[in-house]
Amino acid sequence: MHFIAISINHRTADVALREQVAFRDDALRLAHEDLFETKSILENVILSTCNRTEVYAIVDQIHTGRYYIQRFLARSFGFDVDDIKNMSEVKVGDEAVEHLLRVTSGLDSIVLGETQILGQMRDAFFLAQDIQTTGTIFNHLFKQAITFAKKAHNETDIADNAVSVSYAAVELAKKVFGKLKGKQTIIIGAGEMSELSLLNLLGSGIDDITVVNRTETNAYKLATKHGVNYNTLESLPTLLTNADIVISSTSSPDFIVTKSMIESVNLKRKASSLLLIDIAVPRDIEPNVNISENIFSYDVDDLKGLVDANLRERQMAADFIASQIPDEVQAHNDWVNMLGVVPVIRALREKAMTIQSETMDSIDRKLPDLSDRERTIISKHTKSIINQMLKDPIKQAKELSNDKRSNEKLELFQNIFDIDAADPYEDIKAHKAQKEKEVSIRHIFSFE
């Protein structure tokens, strides 16, 4: 058994390619089933998001498994196998386990430490579980990865620091006002940065938002898309009278918010605070508009300093999380190695107890006059002899779990005791072998 991960992500393929190799939500169930029916695949989980499509699989042979996964992806999206090879990266064994842990923790994301991927990985695993394409190893490993990621986020707060200018603007507003719910907010501009700011504001609990723009149609489109208010740029001085927060991001060559405008508006305002955040280049808000102690003004350089500091903090948190991953990989390996020992020990115990049972049957035939008490004593002592005899072999078998040649030595162990440990994938392998046989027969008798 081997663990293999094949990943198409932001490092291996540009966005145009990634868009072509993403499974739709309604196609994922069938994709899991199709892959599970593929030769060499014993367990599989498929993760497909806007930034990555990944196949995690337990395979019986590395080279065969890798080829059939790549062929599956090629067939699913209409590419050649070589195309899939060129746009993907392959991880095997410990590297695959490490990759899964990094992805689930957000260390492999475009935005370092983001938490959305954790939910996406959890959903992918639950879907695979529901379809029954996971087994003993993945049921344990994916739970381990999800638990590790949750713990990492809780212990480091890696996702708490803003690392985009638009998000930093909202975080700055939280620092000034505390809770943002109920704050009247103006967004100047209707472009991408304005929309990102709008989304972050909505996510923070603000619902009293007005979009203003020189072109009223654009303000209308953005506002109606997200269920907020809109107005013309000419209405800005009036709106400023009651506003708490202003975020500006236009492409205007001239100042939109001037010092004279703020001086005029401030005469009509109560003593409440006004936060002006300028994320435009060139600047939309004239410098030195903070004419009183209750007016706060920040530009993109101020926010960039906050973002840079937060990025450094995120990187430190990411480094700490990454330092924990080798221990997690080792813990998984220890568990897998012990997993191989358990069926061997079980088979040894079953053989020993079969011998004991047959011995008791023989005693019953030869000594039919034994009382129940005598029979119980004999049975108890024969079991005790067996347990004493098995004590050292079982101890040795358990120690093999940490041996680099554990598979080879466990096979020798089974030969010595003439036992055959059950293969947990025996039924799956038999099903695939039968399917291949049927395909071969159809091919032989095909006249096409």
Swiss-Prot record:
Annotated domain remarks: Possesses an unusual extended V-shaped dimeric structure with each monomer consisting of three distinct domains arranged along a curved 'spinal' alpha-helix. The N-terminal catalytic domain specifically recognizes the glutamate moiety of the substrate. The second domain is the NADPH-binding domain, and the third C-terminal domain is responsible for dimerization.
Residues the record lists as binding substrate: 49-52, 109, 114-116, 120
Annotated keywords: NADP, Oxidoreductase, Porphyrin biosynthesis
Top-rank lineage group of the source organism: Bacteria
GO biological process, one term: protoporphyrinogen IX biosynthetic process
Subunit comment: Homodimer.
Role summary: Catalyzes the NADPH-dependent reduction of glutamyl-tRNA(Glu) to glutamate 1-semialdehyde (GSA).
Enzyme kind, highest EC tier: oxidoreductase
Pfam family, one: Shikimate_DH
NCBIfam families per UniProt: hemA (TIGR01035)
Record InterPro entries: 4pyrrol_synth_GluRdtase (IPR000343), 4pyrrol_synth_GluRdtase_dimer (IPR015896), 4pyrrol_synth_GluRdtase_N (IPR015895), GluRdtase_CS (IPR018214), GluRdtase_dimer_dom_sf (IPR036453), GluRdtase_N_sf (IPR036343), NAD(P)-bd_dom_sf (IPR036291), Shikm_DH/Glu-tRNA_Rdtase (IPR006151)
Protein name: Glutamyl-tRNA reductase
GO function terms (MF aspect): glutamyl-tRNA reductase activity; NADP binding
EC nos: 1.2.1.70
RNA-binding recorded as keyword: no
PANTHER family: GLUTAMYL-TRNA REDUCTASE 1, CHLOROPLASTIC (PTHR43120:SF1)
Chain positions recorded as NADP(+) binding sites: 189-194
Record gene name: hemA
Gene3D superfamilies associated with the record: Glutamyl-tRNA reductase, N-terminal domain, NAD(P)-binding Rossmann-like Domain
Family: Belongs to the glutamyl-tRNA reductase family.
Keyword RNA-binding carried by entry: no
UniProt miscellaneous comment: During catalysis, the active site Cys acts as a nucleophile attacking the alpha-carbonyl group of tRNA-bound glutamate with the formation of a thioester intermediate between enzyme and glutamate, and the concomitant release of tRNA(Glu). The thioester intermediate is finally reduced by direct hydride transfer from NADPH, to form the product GSA.
